[in-house]
């Protein structure tokens, strides 16, 4: 696994999850002129930084301003929403609750506005994590690999739910600064890799997860090099008898971690099998002879 932290986060690619959505009775958004001063109104000027001495966050923010008291239904009414980096929101004087979200990182603060400009700066110690997978020197296609992100280290005791269960390769996950571990699944069989990583505030960390596996195509044939027989039920098992993958078809493809296996084919009430080895990065066909 390669960790390659780069500099401060620039405007980021697509996020892997939408920002947290507070339970609100949403109103149509009202766009306030930037910096406009309206008689009898107040201006709420908002900014967010990665940390006390770190840069201003320039994109990816979602600001929501709520009433500071619930309505008759017990809901805190959404007053304004803005997706700008440094919005100036014009509001009547009074009390409000400001919520800002940046990926999975968020903060909330109560404010009291008077007939003047109130400048509020939030600290969101977040960093970006971008992951890709490789077999040998080859990049694994995005549609063949997925990543789950968990809080803490893989070596800590106890079960934990995933923070982000299905991150696509190349997407940027925005996370609070801290330690995480990645569970990488190449295919849907047994090629699984776990890696601990560290996310730093204001930085984009690129991680490459290396799998030792190959893509194997299974064929049941009457003779070597012959046509594959349709309607074949397949099982791939380990030498110890553990079932790794089951499928039905003439040409099933399975991604397997390197190692020793046995292919079992069932067709028209008959069972055929053969042992085979998977070598890292060497894709191939395994023919089982129907004899």
Q: What residue ranges belong to the model's regions?
A:
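Compositionally biased, proline/threonine/alanine/serine-rich low-complexity intrinsically disordered stretches
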Residues: 1-41
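Short Pro-Gly-centered beta-turn/loop motif in secreted/extracellular proteins
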Residues: 82-97, 101-104, 166-181, 186-189, ...
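C-terminal soluble interaction/assembly domains
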Residues: 192, 240-267, 271-281
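Short, ordered, surface-exposed loop/turn motifs in non-cytosolic proteins
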Residues: 52-71, 137-157, 223-242
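Short, structured motif recognition centered on aromatic/hydrophobic residues
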Residues: 44-46, 60-66, 96-98, 124, ...
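Structured interaction patches on ligand/partner-binding surfaces of diverse proteins
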Residues: 20-31, 82-83, 102-125, 187-210, ...
